[in-house]
Amino acid sequence: MNKAPINLQDTFLNQVRKENMPVTIYLVNGFQLKGLVRGFDNFTVVIEFEGKQQMVYKHAISTVMPLRPINLVAASQASAEER
């Protein structure tokens, strides 16, 4: 019964990606980007808005705000079951 630690960042981004939930991403310079998360890795997030994709480096991101609340408990349990 060895539980792996929950990676909250990956769980959150994966959930908004799977649900096609619109997000607003606030950058450290105050600029905001709106769109859908299409993918992410350790260093970047790819978002799409009006048919255009942008790759944003995570170190430039201040906040990611989804349109609706995310159920992180259910998402992390589903993620653990996939492992």
Curated annotation (Swiss-Prot):
GO terms for cellular component: cytosol. Transmembrane segments: none annotated. The keyword Electron transport does not apply. Keywords: RNA-binding, Stress response. InterPro entries: Hfq, LSM_dom_sf, Sm. GO terms for molecular function: RNA binding. Gene3D superfamilies: 2.30.30.100. Residues 10-70 form the Sm domain. GO terms for biological process: regulation of DNA-templated transcription; regulation of RNA stability; regulation of translation, ncRNA-mediated. Coiled coil: none annotated. HAMAP family: Hfq (MF_00436). RNA chaperone that binds small regulatory RNA (sRNAs) and mRNAs to facilitate mRNA translational regulation in response to envelope stress, environmental stress and changes in metabolite concentrations. Also binds with high specificity to tRNAs. Belongs to the Hfq family. Homohexamer. This is RNA-binding protein Hfq. The lineage of its organism: Bacteria, Bacillati, Bacillota, Clostridia, Eubacteriales.
